[in-house]
């Protein structure tokens, strides 16, 4: 309680005795700010007129350091307009002095209960669901699917854009399953060279190929009894897809260089940022393998479709990163919150992580402001419009039509240039995997060479 008249402070303390709460009384704004800095209270009763500063000055100082602490102003009749203005700046309520005991008790009790409920709501929202953060309706549907499917041995096929948390989802499925205490083994089919991925998956014996100095266990054997997660599955070579299908059907496999069959019990979870059925139709993914694995589909929504989850995730990451980097950041400014809500996040949660890491490392303070954000967020004046440009209204002649691969090549090269040669970043904006771009660049180089030979 911040009240400079001792008799009034003593009277109000007696009014609040039945609530069984601890009350600390100070008589100046400076003492109030220092006291709150030492120990954050559950509620502040603040007189509008103080001997050393105004109640509004105290309000601003408190909101700077402890933005979540509720404040109830106490004011005389002539200052009601100021009290209303204070509520616009974050005060929760105001009392007109002199106030009766019942009115004071009800106001204080309601303010404390409201603050406690708000804190519990925030805590509940920020509780991780098996590693996820977010309480949007789209994510609630994901959580329900995980809960329903986790106990089954049926294969789960996770789809979603890059950076949406497909591996987190796979780990959540494993943790919620009966196999949760057994191994979870992940293998990224796009990150391993074609000639090594079979060895990574099934293992190899000594001397199976150059460099195989010792026998090595593969991911399939390591996952025995647990879950085998095949990330970016649609990047797998067709020849290896055949062997994978046999492994799924029989539960047996051979190490590279061995004729001996090994048997394991694994639950398959796989993921891709592509449309798996489209990959089947275009001949890049085996149809029989698709039907074997696409038993329970689970789509992860992009961050832009998750509403205020972006703010929940941002605050969770901010707290972790600030502590890790030894910084004091505790909140986002209102402008940053709005910018985060507007932005389309083409790189999803992974991009949000990178943005916050950049800000925390390169800046100081307690609040993240717009000027701290890296491009393109600090340059946005409106939500990014990622819609494709409209087709040219004028008719084109047949001489102006280019092969589709050349048009695609131009679009990808422009994206790479815009991203300063950073192919993984360009892939994020183009909504494809980096390996897709590398593969296409190689194919186009071969086509250009063929064209030159024809000349």
From Swiss-Prot:
Gene Ontology molecular function: ATP binding; ATP hydrolysis activity; cis-regulatory region sequence-specific DNA binding; DNA-binding transcription activator activity
Sigma-54 factor interaction domain: residues covered: 132-361
Signal peptide positions (record): none
Record-level GO cellular component terms: protein-DNA complex
Domain Response regulatory: 1-112
Disulfide pattern: none
Gene3D superfamilies: 1.10.8.60, 3.40.50.2300, Homeodomain-like, P-loop containing nucleotide triphosphate hydrolases
Pfam families: HTH_8, Response_reg, Sigma54_activat
Alphabetical list of InterPro entries matching this protein: AAA+_ATPase (IPR003593), CheY-like_superfamily (IPR011006), Homeodomain-like_sf (IPR009057), HTH_Fis (IPR002197), P-loop_NTPase (IPR027417), QS_regulatory_LuxO (IPR053402), Sig_transdc_resp-reg_receiver (IPR001789), Sigma_54_int (IPR002078)
Positions that bind ATP: 160-167, 223-232
Keyword terms, alphabetized: ATP-binding, DNA-binding, Nucleotide-binding, Phosphoprotein, Repressor, Transcription, Transcription regulation, Two-component regulatory system
Sequence positions bearing 4-aspartylphosphate: 47
More info: In strain El Tor C6706, at low cell density, LuxO acts indirectly on virulence gene expression by repressing hapR This leads to the expression of virulence factors. In strain El Tor N16961, the hapR gene is inactive due to a natural frameshift mutation.
Function description: Involved in the regulation of different processes depending on the cell density. Acts together with sigma-54 to repress, perhaps indirectly, some genes.
Protein name per Swiss-Prot or TrEMBL: Regulatory protein LuxO
Organism per entry: Vibrio cholerae serotype O1 (strain ATCC 39315 / El Tor Inaba N16961)
């Amino acid at each position: 309680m911040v009240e400079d008249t001792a008799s009034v402070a003593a009277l109000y303390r007696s009014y609040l005795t039945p609530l069984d709460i601890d009350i600390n009384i100070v008589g100046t704004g400076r003492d109030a700010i220092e006291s709150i800095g030492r120990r954050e209270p559950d509620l502040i009763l603040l007189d509008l007129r103080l001997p050393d500063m105004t109640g509004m000055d105290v309000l601003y100082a408190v909101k700077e350091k402890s933005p979540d602490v509720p404040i109830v102003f106490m004011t005389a009749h002539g200052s009601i307009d100021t009290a209303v203005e204070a509520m616009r700046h974050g005060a929760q309520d105001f009392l007109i002095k002199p106030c009766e005991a019942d009115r004071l008790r009800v106001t204080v009790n309601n303010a404390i209960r409201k603050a406690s409920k708000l804190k519990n709501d925030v805590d509940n929202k920020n509780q991780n669901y098996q590693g996820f953060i977010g309480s949007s309706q789209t994510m609630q549907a994901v959580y329900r699917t995980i809960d329903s499917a986790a106990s089954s041995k049926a294969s789960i096929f996770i789809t979603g854009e890059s950076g949406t948390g497909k591996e987190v989802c796979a780990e959540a499925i494993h943790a919620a399953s009966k196999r949760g205490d057994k191994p979870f083994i992940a293998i990224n089919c796009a990150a391993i060279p074609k000639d090594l991925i079979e060895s990574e998956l099934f293992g190899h014996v000594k001397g199976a190929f150059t460099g195989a100095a010792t026998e090595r266990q593969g991911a399939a054997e390591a996952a025995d009894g647990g879950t085998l997660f095949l990330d970016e599955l649609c990047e797998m070579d067709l020849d290896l897809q055949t062997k994978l299908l046999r492994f799924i059907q029989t539960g047996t496999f051979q190490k590279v260089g061995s004729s001996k069959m090994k048997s394991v019990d694994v639950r398959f979870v796989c993921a891709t940022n592509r449309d798996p059925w489209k990959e089947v139709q275009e001949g890049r993914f085996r149809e029989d393998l698709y039907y074997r694995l696409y038993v329970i589909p689970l789509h992860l929504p992009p961050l832009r479709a998750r509403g205020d989850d972006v703010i929940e995730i941002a605050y969770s990451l901010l707290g972790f990163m600030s502590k890790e980097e030894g910084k004091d950041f505790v909140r986002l400014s209102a402008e940053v919150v709005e910018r985060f809500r507007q932005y389309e996040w083409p790189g999803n949660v992974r991009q949000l992580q990178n943005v916050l890491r950049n800000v925390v490392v390169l800046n100081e303070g307690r609040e993240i402001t717009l000027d701290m954000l890296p491009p393109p967020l600090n340059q946005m004046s409106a939500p990014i419009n990622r819609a494709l440009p409209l087709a040219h209204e004028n008719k084109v002649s047949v001489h102006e039509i280019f092969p589709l691969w050349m048009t695609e090549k131009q679009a990808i090269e422009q994206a790479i240039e815009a991203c300063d040669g950073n192919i993984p970043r360009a892939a994020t904006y183009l909504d494809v995997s980096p390996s897709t771009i590398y593969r296409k660049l190689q194919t186009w180089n071969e086509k250009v060479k063929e064209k030159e030979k024809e000349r």
